[in-house]
């Protein structure tokens, strides 16, 4: 791995322990990143074990290609395609564990050229896969106040969404201004239009940058599809281990596990026969333990782990 952009895997041992690795099992790491979790899984697999890792970031793929272990296969694509990849491998119902480490990796944040961070000047891009889709700069050039407001409010949960959106459009429409193409430009603009009484500990641009990244990469849709796909491909007693980094992600994971643990909800008093009730299906998962958060020691070593939450579930 490049010394320039090191990555420390969050909740590494807890998430791998949650998979209850079998030496001859078949596992999916839906988010290879820089390979911390994948390497840990591989270290616990025997000769007949298999690990298939997924990532859509070309830099992650380059890192994955340095692994020569014959038990390992890298798949270039979004983790929302998890079920499709497993179908092509003819392994549906045979997967012993799926790991999803959501959010942006440290190398992506630290590399100014990727445009994810307001702390470093770089092109205003934010795409997980720079070869597809459009950069944030292009979207901001075309979107109206209502659309920008919705994105910031929906994905950034920022109460100043309208004010920020209005400021972006006003800046854009002033012909004397340079086009918004740099992260530093956008961060400075947001700081200027945010209320002076805005006294959060976080930088005023934190929530907006998160919102634009989530939107431009369709992250929540990707997560929803990946969770459903994982459920479909897991073997009985197979484990799902998911690390999230903000409340929107964790809420999705929590609600998904809760919903699949309850099974179909039939309104009280609805006249259904036993056969009809059976046809509706039953609970498909069960939660394993409670949500796990990083220890103080881990946060001290890696401050970016402070908001992470690990949830584990088992296929029934």
From Swiss-Prot:
Residues engaged in binding S-adenosyl-L-methionine: 35-37, 55, 79, 101, 108
InterPro entries for this protein: RsmH, SAM-dep_MeTrfase_MraW_recog, SAM-dependent_MTases_sf
Report the catalytic activity: cytidine(1402) in 16S rRNA + S-adenosyl-L-methionine = N(4)-methylcytidine(1402) in 16S rRNA + S-adenosyl-L-homocysteine + H(+)
> By its UniProt entry, which PANTHER family does this protein fall under?
12S RRNA N4-METHYLCYTIDINE METHYLTRANSFERASE, S-ADENOSYL-METHYLTRANSFERASE MRAW
Q: Name one GO biological process term.
A: rRNA base methylation
MF terms per GO, please?
rRNA (cytosine-N4-)-methyltransferase activity
Its recorded name reads Ribosomal RNA small subunit methyltransferase H
List, alphabetically, the GO terms of the cellular component aspect. Answer: cytoplasm
Per the UniProt record, the lineage of the source organism begins with: Bacteria, Pseudomonadati, Pseudomonadota, Gammaproteobacteria, Vibrionales
Species this chain originates from: Aliivibrio fischeri (strain MJ11)
Pfam families recorded: Methyltransf_5 (PF01795)
Keyword set for this entry? Cytoplasm, Methyltransferase, rRNA processing, S-adenosyl-L-methionine, Transferase
| Entry keyword rRNA processing | yes
This molecule's function is given as:
Specifically methylates the N4 position of cytidine in position 1402 (C1402) of 16S rRNA.
Q: What is its EC number?
A: 2.1.1.199
The EC class name is transferase
The source's domain of life comes to Bacteria
Record-stated family = Belongs to the methyltransferase superfamily. RsmH family.
Localization terms from the record:
Cytoplasm
| Protein's gene | rsmH
């Amino acid at each position: 791995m490049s010394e320039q952009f090191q990555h420390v895997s969050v909740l590494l041992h807890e998430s791998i322990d949650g998979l209850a690795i079998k030496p001859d099992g078949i596992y999916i790491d839906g988010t290879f990143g820089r390979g911390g979790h994948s390497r840990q899984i591989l270290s616990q697999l025997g000769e007949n074990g298999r690990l298939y890792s997924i990532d859509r970031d070309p830099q992650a793929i380059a890192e994955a290609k340095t692994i020569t272990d014959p038990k390992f296969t890298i798949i270039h694509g979004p983790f929302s395609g998890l079920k499709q990849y497993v179908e092509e491998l003819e392994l549906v119902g045979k997967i012993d564990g799926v790991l999803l480490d959501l959010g942006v990796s440290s190398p992506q944040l630290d590399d100014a050229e990727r445009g994810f961070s307001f702390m470093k000047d770089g092109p205003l891009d934010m795409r997980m896969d720079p070869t597809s889709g459009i950069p944030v700069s292009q979207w901001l050039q075309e979107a109206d106040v209502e659309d920008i407001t919705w994105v910031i409010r929906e994905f950034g949960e920022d109460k100043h969404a309208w004010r920020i959106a209005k400021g972006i459009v006003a800046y854009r429409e002033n012909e004397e201004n340079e086009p918004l193409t740099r992260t530093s430009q956008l961060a400075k603009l947001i700081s200027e239009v945010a209320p002076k009484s805005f006294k959060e500990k976080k930088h005023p641009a934190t929530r907006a940058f998160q919102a634009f990244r989530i939107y431009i990469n369709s992250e929540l849709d990707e997560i929803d599809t990946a969770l459903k796909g994982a459920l479909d491909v897991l073997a009985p007693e197979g484990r799902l281990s998911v690390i999230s980094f903000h409340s929107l992600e964790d809420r999705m994971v929590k609600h998904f596990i809760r919903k699949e643990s309850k099974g179909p909800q039939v309104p009280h008093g609805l006249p259904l026969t036993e056969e009809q009730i059976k046809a509706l299906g039953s609970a498909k998962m069960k939660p394993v333990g409670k949500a796990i958060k990083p220890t103080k020691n881990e946060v001290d070593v890696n401050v970016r782990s402070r908001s992470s939450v690990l949830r584990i579930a088992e296929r029934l």
